[in-house]
From Swiss-Prot:
GO terms for molecular function: DNA-binding transcription factor activity; protein heterodimerization activity; transcription cis-regulatory region binding. InterPro entries: CBFA_NFYB_domain (IPR003958), Dr1-like (IPR044255), Histone-fold (IPR009072). Belongs to the NC2 beta/DR1 family. This is Protein Dr1 homolog. It comes from Arabidopsis thaliana (Mouse-ear cress). Residues 148-159 have a biased composition (Basic and acidic residues). Residues 135-159 are annotated as: Disordered. Keywords: Nucleus, Transcription. GO terms for biological process: regulation of DNA-templated transcription. It comes from the Eukaryota. The keyword Transferase does not apply. Transmembrane segments: none annotated.
Length: 159
């Protein structure tokens, strides 16, 4: 595959983070095994090629189903088509774990962000309160009253 075949990106753009890949490589091997820099680079290239292969096949599966977005099911089917069926169970388990962790993160962020559960009116009132605080800070701590509906305020400007 030509490096420029990857959606107009150069070879450098279509790579994986070296530090992360080096860490993964070291974690997968016994502690007494060292990997030469050239071998690490080759492994990274192989990983990029594998990702491109699975992505391309997933896209083909997606297109055959007249879909516009590649779904996890398309990736699993692509693995089967490419002869990597023995990995499907492990990949699916990793996908389920990812979904679970993402759901946990979302629930935690909602718990720590009470604004996410405000009604539109409450959010607007909170926004106005924060604007008033900001105006007070900008005016040296002096609170400047603001009309509730500036577009209908008929007061004349003070000289």
């Amino acid at each position: 595959m030509d490096p420029m075949d990857i959606v107009g990106k150069s070879k450098e753009d279509a790579s994986l983070p070296k530090a992360t890949m080096t860490k993964i490589i070291k974690e997968m091997l016994p502690p007494d095994v060292r990997v030469a820099r050239d071998a690490q680079d080759l492994l990274i290239e192989c990983c990029v090629e594998f990702i491109n292969l699975v992505s391309s096949e997933s896209n083909d599966v997606c297109n055959k189903e007249d879909k516009r977005t590649i779904a996890p099911e398309h990736v699993l089917k692509a693995l089967q088509v490419l002869g990597f069926g023995e990995y499907i169970e492990e990949v699916y388990a990793a996908y389920e774990q990812h979904k679970y962790e993402t759901m946990q993160d979302t629930q935690r962020s909602v718990k720590w962000n009470p604004g996410a559960q405000m009604t539109e009116e409450e959010a607007a009132a909170e926004q106005q309160r924060m604007f008033a605080e900001a105006r007070a800070r900008m005016n040296g701590g002096v609170s400047v009253p603001q009309p509730e509906h500036p577009e209908t305020d008929q007061r004349s400007p003070q000289s």
